[in-house]
Structures are given as C-alpha cells and as structure tokens.
C-alpha cells in the first residue's frame, strides 16, 4: 500500500524519519514528520501493519508535494529468518510441535551467509545485495578472498598422548577439547604467511573440524581476531560431508570470481580451478588428518617426515599467491568499469599453465594397467600445468617420466637425448609452481620407485613396476604348471597328513584299527552264522578301501563331495589337467593376482574340476615338509598291511570260537 502526502496550503518540508528502511511497523506507526516554517506541523502514519519501504529521494529538508509517495507498506516476506523465526516481523514460522525447517508459512529466505551462524538465512535478493556490497568493498581495497584449510595445510594436530616441551617449541600448543588432550603444531612460516596474506586477501577458514575445534585453532593462529575475525566455516556449517564447494554459492551469492583456495586435497573441492593444492604437512608420527571425511582417500603416514622442521612450502605458496594477486589487479586495471568482473580462476589457470608450457611428456610404468590415463591424477596435474601427454616417444617429446629404468620408452628417450626423469620431477614442479631442474631427478638404474603420494596421485607402485615376462619364461612356466597339475591328486593329501609327523600318523592309524577291529568282531557273529567268513571279510576290506579313497578325494576337493557320491565315474573324466592358458584365464576371471616376479608366481587355483596345484606362497613350509612326504607306494603298502592285519584278527577270532 502506497502512503501519499495529502498536502497543505503552506509549503511543507520533510522532517526526520521515525522508522528505518525495511523495518516492520504496526498500524498508526509514525513514519515521518513534516514541517512548516521550521516547525513541526504534522505527522504521517501507517494505515496498516507491514514492512516499510520509503520513496526514492526522501530525506529531511526536501519540499513535499501533494500526492507524493512517502512510503510503501507491504506484507512481510520473511526475508530474514533465524531458527524458523522471522527476524523482521518476529513471527514464529515453525509448525506447532514440528521440527526445524517445518514451517506453517512460506519464506523467501534460503541462503545462509554467516559462517558461524548457519541458522540465519536470508532471501536471494538480500543475499545478492550484501554480496555485491562485499565485492565492491574488496575491489576498493584491492583484495581477493582466500579460503584456508587447516589440517595438514597450515597445521598438524594429534590426539595421541605425548610429552612436548611447549616452552622451547612455541609453535606447538596443547589444549583440552571434548575431554581429550590435543597437540597442534604450526607449519613453519605460518605466522608470517598469514600476516602477509592478510594485506592482499580477505581470509576465511574452511575446515572439516568441528566448530569448537575450528574456533580453538583460530585463537591459536589469530589471538586478536584480526586476520579471520568470525569468518570460520566448520564441519557443523558445511552442507556436504564430502565436498566443501557446496557452500561457495551461499557465502558468495554474486559469484566466486574473487575466491582463491589453498588446501592439501583437491577432491573435497571437486578439483576446482581456484584451488592451489599444496603438499600435506605431517609432523606427528603415524597421524594423518584427524578431521578427514569418512571414506576419503587420506592415507596415514608411516614415518614422521625428516624435513618436517625444514618445511618451506608456505614460502613457495606465498610467492604464488602474491603473483596471482598482482596479475589479477594488473588485468583488472586494464578493463573498463562497465565490464563483467574478472574471474581470478582465469589468472590462476594462466599462471599454472606457464610452469610446464612447451613440455611434451611420455609416461613409462607410471599408470597402473587397466586404468585410463585421463582419469589419473598424474595426468591431470601435468595437463593443468601446461604439459602435453603423448603415448609414444617421438622427436617432439621432451620428457619421459618413468618408474623404472630399462623399459623400451626409456631406451628410446636416451637414444634421442630426451630428458628421462622420475615422477618426483613432476611433483617438484607442481609443489613449487616452477619448472624443476631435470638433472636433479634423472632416472637411473639405482633410482627407486616413489614412496607415498605427495599430492594425492593415484600412482600405484606395485602394479606399475611389474616385470615383463618373456616368451621363454612363459614356456618354462607353462611346463612347470602342467607338470604340477599332472601329479596325482593324493599328493596334496599326503602332505597334509604328514605335516604332523609319522608318529602322529601311526597313532591315528592305531585308533582307526581298534575301531575297525571292534566293528569286524561284531560282523563276525553274522558272518559265522552265514558260513561265509572269508568272503565277508574280503568285501568289508574292499568297501573300506573304496570309502577311504573317496574320503581322500573329498578332502582334496570338498566342493565335489556331492557329485562324487552320486557317481564315481565322473571323477575319471575330471582327471584331465587344465592347460596353462585356461588356468591363467580362469585366475584372471576370478580376480586372482599374478605377481610381478616369475619365480614367485602363484596360481591359487581350485577349479570346478578339483585341480589344485601346490601353493608356492607357502614355499618355506613346503620345504620343511619335503623330507616328510610319503611316496605313493607307501599308501599301497599301508593298505596291504591293514588288510593283512584285519584278516589275521578275523582268523584268530574264528579260531578262539572254535576252541
């Protein structure tokens, strides 16, 4: 509803406003006074309740004309809401008995702009007004925005019990939080880095640590609240448990054109072009990022880094960020004031691309087999920093990045006088944003594969350095496997029985004989009545031997038990060993691993036909048991001795009855 000035015969001027712009007023609330000859002559009141919006150009002292719109009173749109209560009109928007967010009335507020007060949300229109004012303020002060991660970027925190002399180590702080003792170590050069960056950047903390933890670290880094103030975004305010990018639109509703990020991990920022990824800082032994999101790729370090005290990463990053700031405002000054605001990501991309510009790189043994080159981090890093990746060594290639010496690509590169370097050369270029000296990272016969993943690369040492297998070696392996598969299936059973020694085997045999003797004595009564003692004993022995043989086969291959019970003839068809190619194909289909060394090749196969070669992984145990292995002939002798013993026992029993 528009409120207009009714006019007066005399000249009237506007007095002081009695309400603020955008405020909620009740009916008959005084909006403004008007004067005649410098004295208050009347007041203009609201005919209803609502939100006040004053007319343009209305200010004290101006002449009021009849019919002029003084203000507009409209219904509250609830543009500012905190905990489901409108901050403008004070109305409770939550349903009775409802949970947070369950409102009985619609609201235009949906943007959370305050770092540490996520419950305070504003409308899109108001958010853009605030964001635009913030941008103008930054440009006026010639600053950019810097989002700073905490853990393993500028600090390292441990929750392990330890004794630390904090008096002699001023950069180490111990404190209690959530009934636990934490120890935090500042990365070398952190204080100087933050102080210098504050002159060029408006700094914000963005961390996966909890709110109390984040604010406690901020007190350590910025005790006067001068660098970060209250611009602290913790896990409690983040919209996603896996990514930090979702909050950027809320924090910067007009766009992230001025935002630069430093973090030790790129995945949580979805590999944003605004990210300056830095080497993780690890000081405490066997402690990674205690606040890393679940299911993340973060890996625990095995040892404390020897150069933890000599870390100079922040000095390099300070140089990079200073250069980005200067380049941005150089380009900004050349643009017209009416043009769209320059995006700092364009400057970052351009400066990053200069590092390896002109480099044509071939990888040798770096990318694991079966993985697409374009999806690896080593490929992403090289291309981001300006290199071109090609598959083969040609005259245009400048570098071969290899994992081991002696490959064909390395040989070709040496023959063409190309740089042959280790993967550490790439990491050194990425970490410092400078092209490193190739002579310091030459790949030689003495070079060792890299340990760890400095910038989160998916470089897999074990798979990437598998030795190649020649045709002769494959032929030898084929023969060895065929011979192993052609051995009698009972060999494996003999090894299992003889592992405990011959004495144990004899004891078990005696126990079995006693049981059989008792059984045969019971059968003797029946046999004697039928008058066929000898035939019955022979049949019992034959059944016993056949049952023992079937038991051995079932023990060797349990999954064939049911089939063998149904038909013994099926086993005769299954005795044909698998060929080497079929065996290898079956192993690959079932996900079994073929190791890199020929001598250590393991084919852990237990196929449907019951063929199971000896496990070479247990080579040491097999060597110990070689002397105790029982040959096949011993099995036959054992059965013959057993049969003879049973016959003698039966014969003695018959003689005793006759007597």
Curated annotation (Swiss-Prot):
* UniProt feature, compositional bias: Acidic residues: 484-504, 560-576, 596-607, 616-640
By its UniProt entry, which InterPro entries does this protein fall under? BRCT_dom (IPR001357), BRCT_dom_sf (IPR036420), Fcp1 (IPR039189), FCP1_dom (IPR004274), FCP1_euk (IPR011947), HAD-like_sf (IPR036412), HAD_sf (IPR023214)
What PROSITE patterns does its record include?
A: BRCT, FCP1
Q: Where in the cell is it found?
A: Nucleus
Q: Which UniProt keywords apply?
A: Differentiation, Hydrolase, Nucleus, Oogenesis, Protein phosphatase
Annotated FCP1 homology domain ranges read 139-303
Polar residues composition-biased segments? 529-538
Biological processes annotated in GO: negative regulation of transcription by RNA polymerase II; oogenesis
A single GO molecular function term of this UniProt record: RNA polymerase II CTD heptapeptide repeat phosphatase activity
Biased composition (Basic and acidic residues) is annotated at 505-519
Domain BRCT, first and last residues per copy: 351-443
User: Positions of the region Disordered?
Assistant: 484-640
Give me the reactions it catalyses. Answer: O-phospho-L-seryl-[protein] + H2O = L-seryl-[protein] + phosphate; O-phospho-L-threonyl-[protein] + H2O = L-threonyl-[protein] + phosphate
The UniProt entry lists the main location of this chain as nucleus
One Gene Ontology CC term in the entry: nucleus
Q: Name the SUPFAM superfamilies for this protein.
A: BRCT domain, HAD-like
Briefly explain the null phenotype.
Answer: RNAi-mediated knockdown causes an arrest at the 100-cell embryonic stage. In developing oocytes, results in an abnormal accumulation of 'Ser-5' phosphorylated ama-1 and a more diffused nuclear localization of phosphorylated ama-1. 'Ser-2' phosphorylated ama-1 is present in diakinetic oocyte but at low levels indicating that transcription is possibly blocked at the elongation stage. Increased levels of 'Ser-2' phosphorylated ama-1 in embryonic and germline nuclei.
Q: Its Enzyme Commission number?
A: 3.1.3.16
Q: What does this protein do?
A: During the late stages of oogenesis, dephosphorylates 'Ser-5' of the heptad repeats YSPTSPS in the C-terminal domain of the largest RNA polymerase II subunit ama-1. Similarly, dephosphorylates 'Ser-5' of ama-1 in early embryonic cells prior to the activation of the zygotic transcription program at the 4-cell embryonic stage. May dephosphorylate 'Ser-2' of the ama-1 heptad repeats YSPTSPS in embryonic somatic and germline cells.
Its protein name is RNA polymerase II subunit A C-terminal domain phosphatase
Naturally occurring in which organism (per UniProt) = Caenorhabditis elegans
């Amino acid at each position: 509803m528009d409120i207009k000035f009714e006019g007066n015969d005399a000249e009237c001027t506007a007095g002081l406003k009695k309400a603020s712009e955008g405020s909620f007023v009740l009916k008959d609330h005084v909006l403004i006074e008007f004067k005649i000859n410098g004295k208050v002559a009347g007041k203009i009141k609201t005919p209803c309740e609502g939100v006040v919006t004053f007319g343009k150009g209305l200010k004290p002292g101006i002449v009021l004309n009849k019919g002029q719109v003084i203000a507009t009173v409209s219904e509250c749109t609830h543009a500012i809401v905190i905990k489901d209560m409108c901050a403008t009109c004070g109305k409770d928007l939550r349903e009775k008995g409802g949970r947070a967010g369950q409102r009985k009335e619609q609201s235009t507020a949906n943007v959370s702009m305050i770092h540490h007060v996520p419950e305070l949300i504003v409308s899109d229109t108001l958010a853009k007004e605030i964001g635009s004012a913030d941008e103008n303020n930054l440009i006026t002060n010639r600053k950019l925005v810097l989002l700073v991660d905490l853990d393993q970027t500028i600090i390292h925190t441990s929750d392990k019990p330890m004794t630390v002399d904090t008096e002699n180590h001023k950069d180490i702080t111990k404190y209690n939080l959530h009934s636990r003792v934490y120890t935090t170590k500042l990365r070398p050069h952190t204080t100087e880095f933050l102080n210098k960056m504050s002159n060029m950047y408006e700094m914000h903390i963005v961390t996966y640590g909890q709110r109390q933890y984040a604010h406690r670290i901020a007190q350590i880094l910025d005790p006067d609240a001068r660098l970060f103030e209250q611009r602290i975004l913790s896990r409690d305010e983040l919209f996603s448990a896996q990514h930090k990018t979702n909050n950027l639109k809320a924090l910067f509703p007009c766009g992230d054109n001025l935002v630069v990020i430093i973090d030790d991990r790129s995945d949580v920022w979805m590999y944003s072009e605004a990210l300056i990824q830095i080497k993780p800082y690890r000081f405490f032994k066997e402690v990674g990022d205690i606040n890393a999101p679940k299911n993340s790729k973060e890996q625990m370090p095995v040892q404390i880094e020897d150069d933890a005290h000599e870390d100079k990463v922040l000095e390099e990053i300070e140089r990079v960020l200073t250069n980005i700031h200067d380049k941005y405002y150089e380009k900004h000054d050349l643009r017209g004031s009416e043009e769209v605001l320059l995006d700092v990501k364009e400057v970052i991309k351009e400066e990053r691309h200069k590092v390896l510009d002109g480099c044509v790189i071939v990888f040798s043994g770096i990318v694991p087999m079966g993985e697409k080159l374009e999806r690896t981090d080593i490929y992403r890093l090289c291309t981001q920093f300006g290199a071109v990746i090609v598959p083969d060594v040609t005259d245009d290639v400048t570098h071969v990045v290899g994992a081991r010496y002696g490959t064909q690509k390395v040989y070709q590169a040496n023959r063409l006088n190309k740089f042959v370097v280790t993967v550490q050369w790439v990491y050194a270029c990425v970490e410092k944003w400078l092209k490193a000296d190739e002579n310091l990272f030459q790949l030689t016969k003495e070079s060792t594969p890299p340990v760890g993943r400095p910038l989160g690369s998916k470089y897999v040492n074990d798979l990437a350095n598998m030795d190649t297998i020649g045709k002769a070696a494959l032929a030898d392996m084929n023969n060895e496997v065929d011979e192993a598969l052609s051995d009698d299936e009972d060999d494996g059973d003999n090894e299992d029985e003889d592992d405990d020694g011959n004495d144990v085997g004899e004891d078990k045999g005696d126990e079995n004989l006693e049981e059989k003797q008792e059984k045969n004595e019971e059968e003797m009564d029946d046999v004697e009545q039928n008058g066929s003692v000898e035939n019955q004993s022979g049949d019992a022995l034959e059944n016993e031997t056949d049952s023992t043989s079937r038991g051995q086969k079932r023990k060797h291959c349990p999954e064939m038990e049911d089939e063998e019970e149904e038909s013994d003839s099926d086993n005769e068809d299954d005795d044909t060993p698998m060929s080497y190619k079929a065996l290898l194909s079956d192993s690959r289909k079932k996900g079994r691993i073929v190791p890199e060394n020929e001598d250590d090749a393991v084919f852990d196969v237990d196929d449907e036909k019951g063929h199971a070669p000896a496990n070479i992984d247990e080579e040491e145990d097999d060597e110990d048991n070689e002397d105790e292995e029982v040959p096949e002939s011993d099995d036959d002798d054992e059965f013959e001795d057993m049969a003879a013993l049973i016959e003698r026992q039966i014969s003695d029993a018959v003689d005793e009855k006759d007597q």
